[in-house]
Curated annotation (Swiss-Prot):
InterPro entries: HDAC4/5/7/9 (IPR046949), HDAC_PDAC (IPR050284), His_deacetylse (IPR000286), His_deacetylse_dom (IPR023801), His_deacetylse_dom_sf (IPR037138), Ureohydrolase_dom_sf (IPR023696). It comes from Mus musculus (Mouse). The keyword Metal-binding applies. Transmembrane segments: none annotated. Residues 220-235, 350-361, 429-448, 479-491 have a biased composition (Low complexity). Residues 505-852 are annotated as: Histone deacetylase. This is Histone deacetylase 7. CDD domains: HDAC7.
C-alpha cells in the first residue's frame, strides 16, 4: 500500500517548519533531484559529521599552535650557531662541581644511541658472518659518526649543530662529570698514541748518540767525551741513556713478545718468574731488535738481589735462562756497539786508587752479615739496567722511611742485624754482598770510593762503613770529565782508620725519628724542658762535626712488653706501653680495669700529663718510650758481644727516674735498667757497672738493683740534704741484703754557693768512681749520660758549671774499664748548646779522637769545701765495703788535685798507705776506724 503522492516526485510531504516549494514549469531538461534521505539515515550520519567537524577544528588549531614551535626549531643562522655551541661547551667545562648532575646532554644522548645501534649491528653481523674480525674492547680513536646510523637516528632525534671550526669527531663519548675526559677532546690525536711499554724510549728523550769510529772510542779528551751541555742540564741517569733510537711501538711490541715469549712463561701472573737471556737469536736480517739491547747487554753480576722489580708488575723472581747465542757468535756478529762512558761521567782514575780496596779483606767476617741490599718488600719500582750504567750497590733504607710497629721478644733472637728487625725474613732472602764483589769494583767506582773516604755523606744516616764506601749514590758528584778528583784525602778520617784496623770494631750511634713524635699536644716546646729538639739538635751537631760518618749508625728497635716487664710491673707496662691501636691486640678484660685506674693531670699549657712535668701523648708517647728502651738494649748487646767497640744512644724520653710502677721526671721506662737486666738474663755480662752523672739522682735505677751484687750503681748528683728533685740518693743509701755496698751515692750538698764544676767532678772520679770501679772489675759499663749538670742550665734544672771537656774526660776514664766496652745513653739535659757540646765531646772520646784538654786551672784548682765534705762522707760510709776507700781514708795527699801524668806517684803513695791501713785493720774493727777516725787534712 502506497502513501498518497508517493509516485509523484514533485510532491513532498509537508513537514513542520518547512516552506512550500514552487512547481518547476520549465519545458527543457530538468536537473535530477535526489530523493530526500530517510530520517533513520539522517540520524546515523549526523554524529559522523559532527566528529569530522570537531577533528578538523582541532587539527587546524594544532597547526596554528605548532607554527611558532616550528619557527623556533628552525636551525639558527651560521653566525649564531657557533657562538651558542661554544657557550654551551664552556658552561659544561666551567660548571661548578657542586652543581653537576648526571643528566646527559643532547650530544651525549645522540652519541650513546649511535654507539648502541652500532654495537647491535656489529653483533648481528657477527652472528650472520662468524668469520668477521671481532671488535676490540675499547678504542681510543675518535668514533666515526658517519654512515647509516645517522640516517636511521635522524628520524628519531633532532639534528644537533656542531661547531663550524671542528669536525664531528671531536665529540667523543664521555662522562658528564669527569673533567679529565672533557679536556681530552682538545688534545691532538698524537696524545692518544703514547708508548704503552715503560721499556720503550720516550719521544721527548734527547737524540741518541751516533756511532763513533773505532779509533775514537778510546779517546778520553774532554772534547770527545763531554760538552758544556752535559752538565746538570743533561743528567747521567736519563731514561734510556745513549741507546739507539727504537723502532715503531707496534712493531717493537710484536718482536719483543715473539722473541721472549716462547722461551719463558708469560707475565700474566704478577708473581710469575721472569726469564732474561744472556743472548738472543738473530732475526732474518741478521740484527737484533734495538729495543732488546738493554736485556742483551745485562750481565748477571750486576743483579745482586734475588728479585727484579719491573714497573707495574711488582717484585718478580729473577732467573737466567740458557744462553741462546754463544759468545763467539755474539762477538763476531757485531750486533751492538761497544760499551763506553757516557758524556757526563768522570774519567777513570789511575791505578793509584786500587790500594784503597785492600783493607776490605780483613773485615769480611765481621761486616758480611751487615751489608745488605734494600728489602724487596719496600723497594720502589725500578727500571731495568742500562748498558751505560755500572754495577751499583743499593742503599740501606733510612730510619725516617722505615718505622716498624713492634720489636722482638728477646735480644738473643735479635743478635744479628738481619734478625733484629721483625718481619725481615732470613738473610738469604734479602741477599748479601760478598767481599769478592767489592774487590771487583771497576775504575769508575774507585774514583767515587776515594771521594767518599775523603768526606762523609751528610745524607747517609744509617749506613754502615762498608756500605758507605761501596755505595754509589744516584746523583753525580762530578759532571765534567775534566774535573780534578783528589784520590787521597789530606787527613785520614776515622772511617778510614776503621777499615785499616781489623781488631778494633766501630763506635755505634743509635737514633730514630720515632722518638720525635713524643710531644705535648700544645705544640709549644718552650713550655716543656724535655722536647724533641734535644735529640734532633744533638744528631745534627754530630753530623756537622763529621762524627756520624765515623760511626756505625743504627736504627734501634722497639722494646717488647716482656723486656719492659723485666724491670717494671705488668700494670705499669700496659698503662704506658700501649696505645689505642696496640690495645686492640691485647686482652680487653684486663685492660678495661687498668685503664679505669689511670689518672692524668691537665697541664697549664692545655696538654695532658702524668704529672705537672711529664707530658703524655696518647698516640706516640708509648712508642717513643719503648723505642728508647729497645734502642739502648740493642746497642748494649752489640757492645757486650764485642760487635761494636762502644756506643752512644741518642734517645728520648729519659728513663732513670722510672721505677717499678711509677712514671715521673719525664721518664716512663728505665732504658738503662732494662738493658742491664736483659744482659744479665741472657748471660752477656756477669758484672755490670752503671755510672749516672745526671744532676738528678736516678732513683729508678737505684731501686731496681738495690739488692743485686752483680750491678754496681754509682751516682753523682745534686742532693742538698734531700731538698733537690727527686729527694733520694743520700750517701747512706748503700743497698740491702746481698747488694749492700754496691750502691754508691756521691750526693753533692751546699746548694749553689758555690756551684759544682770541673774540679769537683774530677776529684769525685779520682777519689771515688774510678777506684771503686777498678776494684769491682765490670764486664760492661753503662752510663746514664745526663748533661743537665753542664754549664748553662738554670738553678731549678741543675745550676752546676761542668764543662763539655770534663764530660769528655770522664768518658775517656771509663773507657779504661771493661776493655773499653762503654755504652752511653742520653738522660737529662735541656740547654741545647750545652747538651750538644757535651755529646760531641763524649762521642769524640768514644771514637778515640783527640779531645780538647781541660784547662790547667781545672787541674790545679782544689775542690770547694762542700764537695770535700761530700766526698769525705762517701769514703767514710763505703770504707767497710771497699778496700780502696780504706786506703784513701789514711792518705791525705789523695785529696789534693793531681796533674795528668802523676798517676805513678799516686799509685806509689796509695801502696805505701795501704800497708799502714792493713796493720791498723788487724787490730781494730772497721766500725771503730770510722768512729775514731781523725778529721782529714784539708
Amino acid at each position: 500500500m502506497h502513501s498518497p503522492g508517493a509516485g509523484c516526485p514533485a510532491l513532498q510531504p509537508d513537514t513542520p517548519g518547512s516552506q512550500p516549494q514552487p512547481m518547476d514549469l520549465r519545458v527543457g531538461q530538468r536537473p535530477t533531484v535526489e530523493p530526500p534521505p530517510e530520517p533513520a539515515l539522517l540520524t546515523l550520519q549526523h554524529p559522523q559529521r559532527l566528529h569530522r567537524h570537531l577533528f578538523l577544528a582541532g587539527l587546524h588549531q594544532q597547526q596554528r599552535s605548532a607554527e611558532p614551535m616550528r619557527l623556533s626549531m628552525d636551525p639558527p643562522m651560521p653566525e649564531l650557531q657557533g657562538g651558542q655551541q661554544e657557550q654551551e661547551l664552556r658552561q659544561l667545562l666551567n660548571k661548578d662541581k657542586s652543581k653537576r648532575s648526571a643528566v646527559a646532554s643532547s650530544v651525549v644522548k645522540q652519541k650513546l644511541a649511535e654507539v648502541i645501534l652500532k654495537k647491535q649491528q656489529a653483533a648481528l653481523e657477527r652472528t650472520v658472518h662468524p668469520s668477521s674480525p671481532s671488535i676490540p674492547y675499547r678504542t681510543l680513536e675518535p668514533l666515526d659518526t658517519e654512515g647509516a646510523a645517522r640516517s636511521v637516528l635522524s628520524s628519531f632525534l633532532p639534528p644537533v649543530p656542531s661547531l663550524p671550526t671542528e669536525p664531528p669527531e671531536h665529540f667523543p663519548l664521555r662522562k658528564t662529570v669527569s673533567e679529565p675526559n672533557l679536556k681530552l677532546r682538545y688534545k691532538p690525536k698524537k696524545s692518544l698514541e703514547r708508548r704503552k711499554n715503560p721499556l720503550l724510549r720516550k719521544e721527548s728523550a734527547p737524540p741518541s748518540l751516533r756511532r763513533r769510529p773505532a779509533e775514537t772510542l778510546g779517546d778520553s779528551s774532554p772534547s770527545s767525551s763531554s760538552t758544556p751541555a752535559s752538565g746538570c742540564s743533561s743528567p747521567n741517569d736519563s731514561e734510556h741513556g745513549p741507546n739507539p733510537a727504537l723502532g715503531s711501538e707496534a712493531d717493537g711490541d710484536r718482536r719483543t713478545h715473539s722473541t721472549l715469549g716462547p722461551r719463558g712463561p708469560v707475565l700474566g701472573n704478577p708473581h710469575a718468574p721472569l726469564f732474561l737471556h744472556h743472548g738472543l737469536e738473530p732475526e732474518a736480517g741478521g740484527t737484533l731488535p734495538s729495543r732488546l739491547q738493554p736485556i742483551l747487554l745485562l750481565d748477571p753480576s750486576v743483579s745482586h738481589a734475588p728479585l727484579w722489580t719491573v714497573p707495574g708488575l711488582g717484585p718478580l723472581p729473577f732467573h737466567f735462562a740458557q744462553p741462546l747465542l754463544t759468545t763467539e757468535r755474539l762477538s763476531g756478529s757485531g750486533l751492538h756497539r761497544p760499551l763506553n762512558r757516557t758524556r757526563s761521567e768522570p774519567l777513570p782514575p789511575s791505578a793509584t786508587a786500587s790500594p784503597l780496596l785492600a783493607p776490605l779483606q780483613p773485615r769480611q767476617d765481621r761486616l758480611k752479615p751487615h751489608v745488605q741490599l734494600i728489602k724487596p718488600a719496600i723497594s720502589p719500582p725500578q727500571r731495568p739496567a742500562k748498558p751505560s750504567e755500572k754495577p751499583r750497590l743499593r742503599q740501606i733504607p733510612s730510619a725516617e722511611d722505615l718505622e716498624t710497629d713492634g720489636g722482638g721478644v728477646g735480644p738473643m733472637a735479635n743478635d744479628g742485624l738481619e734478625h733484629r728487625e721483625s718481619g725481615r725474613g732470613p738473610p738469604e732472602g734479602r741477599g748479601s754482598i760478598s767481599l769478592q764483589q767489592h774487590q771487583q769494583v771497576p775504575p769508575w767506582e774507585q774514583q767515587h770510593l776515594a771521594g767518599r773516604l775523603s768526606q762523609g755523606s751528610p745524607g747517609d744516616s744509617v749506613l754502615i762503613p762498608l756500605a758507605q764506601v761501596g755505595h754509589r749514590p744516584l746523583s753525580r758528584t762530578q759532571s765534567s770529565p775534566a774535573a780534578p778528583v783528589s784520590l787521597l784525602s789530606p787527613e785520614p778520617t776515622c772511617q778510614t782508620q776503621v777499615l785499616n784496623s781489623s781488631e778494633t770494631p766501630a763506635t755505634g750511634l743509635v737514633y730514630d725519628s720515632v722518638m720525635l713524635k713524643h710531644q705535648c699536644s700544645c705544640g709549644d716546646n718552650s713550655k716543656h724542658p724535655e722536647h724533641a729538639g734535644r735529640i734532633q739538635s744533638i744528631w745534627s751537631r754530630l753530623q756537622e762535626r763529621g762524627l756520624r760518618s765515623q760511626c756505625e749508625c743504627l736504627r734501634g728497635r722497639k722494646a717488647s712488653l716482656e723486656e719492659l716487664q723485666s724491670v717494671h710491673s705488668e700494670r705499669h707496662v700496659l698503662l704506658y706501653g700501649t696505645n689505642p691501636l696496640s690495645r686492640l691486640k691485647l686482652d680487653n678484660g684486663k685492660l678495661t680495669g687498668l685503664l679505669a685506674q689511670r689518672t692524668f693531670v691537665m697541664l697549664p699549657c692545655g696538654g695532658v700529663g702524668v704529672d705537672t712535668d711529664t707530658i703524655w701523648n696518647e698516640l706516640h708517647s708509648s712508642n717513643a718510650a719503648r723505642w728508647a728502651a729497645g734502642s739502648v738494649t740493642d746497642l748494649a748487646f752489640k757492645v757486650a758481644s764485642r760487635e761494636l767497640k762502644n756506643g752512644f744512644a741518642v734517645v728520648r724520653p729519659p728513663g732513670h727516674h722510672a721505677d717499678h710502677s711509677t712514671a715521673m721526671g719525664f721518664c716512663f721506662f728505665n732504658s738503662v735498667a732494662i738493658a742491664c737486666r736483659q744482659l744479665q738474663q741472657h748471660g752477656k755480662a756477669s758484672k755490670i757497672l752503671i755510672v749516672d752523672w745526671d744532676v738528678h739522682h736516678g732513683n729508678g735505677t737505684q731501686q731496681t738493683f738495690y739488692q743485686d751484687p752483680s750491678v754496681l750503681y754509682i751516682s753523682l748528683h745534686r742532693h742538698d740534704d734531700g731538698n733537690f728533685f727527686p729527694g733520694s740518693g743520700a750517701v747512706d743509701e748503700v743497698g740491702t741484703g746481698s747488694g749492700e755496698g754496691f750502691n754508691v751515692n756521691v750526693a753533692w750538698a751546699g746548694g749553689l754557693d758555690p756551684p759544682m764544676g770541673d774540679p769537683e767532678y774530677l776529684a769525685a772520679f779520682r777519689i771515688v768512681v774510678m777506684p771503686i770501679a777498678r776494684e769491682f772489675a765490670p764486664d760492661l759499663v753503662l752510663v746514664s749520660a745526663g748533661f743537665d749538670a753542664a754549664e748553662g742550665h738554670p738553678a731549678p734544672l741543675g745550676g752546676y758549671h761542668v764543662s763539655a771537656k770534663c764530660f769528655g774526660y770522664m768518658t775517656q776514664q771509663l773507657m779504661n774499664l771493661a776493655g773499653g766496652a762503654v755504652v752511653l745513653a742520653l738522660e737529662g739535659g735541656h740547654d741545647l748548646t750545652a747538651i750538644c757540646d757535651a755529646s760531641e765531646a763524649c762521642v769524640a772520646a768514644l771514637l778515640g779522637n783527640k779531645v780538647d784538654p781541660l784547662s790547667e786551672e781545672s787541674w790545679k784548682q782544689k775542690p770547694n769545701l762542700s764537695a770535700i765534705r761530700s766526698l769525705e762522707a762517701v769514703v767514710r760510709v763505703h770504707r767497710k765495703y771497699w778496700g780502696c776507700m780504706q786506703r784513701l781514708a789514711s792518705c791525705p795527699d789523695s785529696w789534693l788535685p793531681r796533674v795528668p801524668g802523676a798517676d805513678a806517684e799516686v799509685e806509689a803513695v796509695t801502696a805505701l798507705a795501704s800497708l799502714s791501713v792493713g796493720i791498723l785493720a788487724e787490730d781494730r774493727p772497721s766500725e771503730r776506724l770510722v768512729e775514731e777516725e781523725e778529721p782529714m787534712n784539708l
